Amino acid sequence: MSKTLNDNLKEYKVSEIPHIRLMGRNVKGALKSGGPVPLFWGAACLDVRAKSGEVWALVETDYSVYEVWACVWVNGRIISRFMLEKGRNWVCLCRGFAPETVNDVRIMRDSQAMCEDPDQIFLVHSFAIEKNGAFLPLKEKKLRIEFVGDSVTSGEGLYGAVDETQWISAWISPSKTYAVKAAEAMDAEFSLVSACGWGIVAAWNNNIECVIPPIYGQVCGLCKGEPQQNLGSCKEFDFDEKPNDFVFVNLGANDYGAFFNEPWIHGGKEYKMHTNPDGSFDEADCMKVSCGIRDFLKVIRKNNPQAKICWVWDMLEMPELSTYMHKGVSMYIAESGDKNVDIRLLPPSSLEKEDEDKGSRNHPGPLTHKLAAAKIIEYCKNTLGYSK
């Protein structure tokens, strides 16, 4: 990383680049604002197609607790991943190519959106290429897919040794998730709306405020810090600007975990998903999950009137709650008459036998994400009538 730019390079603000693609939720008109572009969610990214021997990006980050990680893609493959320093710095995305080489280059946020750090931001100000280089048109993507989820969709556990237990930014890698793998295979634009520990009606620790449905309509509503809100995190998101073709929801694992954890105390009141004396799940609390699924599907459909919606789960197995997950989707379909909603169970992490296949922090590893991506791809192709 560098504070200055080499003399052989020319800087272009994001708004000055004629051909550039932004993926991941953002404020309306972010590419043409004249200012830096924030990357709010995990796997949010900027793509350029550059004729140049090297490509740089001017980025800016800040944080108080959890640093931001980024990764670089060249021609569809990740070539580097690194922790970003605080402040504004030039980052070399790639170099050493012949000047006439044309590369598809992507800089991606490889950290999830962090509600735990109200100061955390990631901005891209500019790109730089050789003075005789050029930005060329990008190939249009065929589809748009949104993935809504928790730590699995955020990529927790996809870096680090199997026995790692500390919760740090380094172990979270959205770029390696089933979601990004599936979207790339489908040649789709993608966006992730996901946060570790968050649920449908309860977070992993029974916190009823760390749930996705209430913030779904916002750009990145879980980030409520002043610098984050100044960038537009809590603004209403414009779903019509780029309508989704598919919305996959992978939530429920933290609601499941809440049954095994201590109550959350807030305002003198106790919140808890209960188990019975025999260890079974309390029926009323299970029904809270079913009703939460039904109600959230109404919100998703309202904002995505034409999309195929599919609720998926089981990468982290939750046998006691699975019936109620099914029930929630069935309740929505029965009440709405919406036939454009499906359920799919994804391969569980219990299939991982070798350390190289496993993730850190007791989360799904590379094998499970690969198998889950294959299921998503198969579902998309079947829905669209693609031949295998």
Task: Annotate each language-model stretch with its function.
Residues 144-148, 153, 190-194, 245-250, ...:
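Structural recognition of the beta-strand scaffold that forms the well-ordered cores
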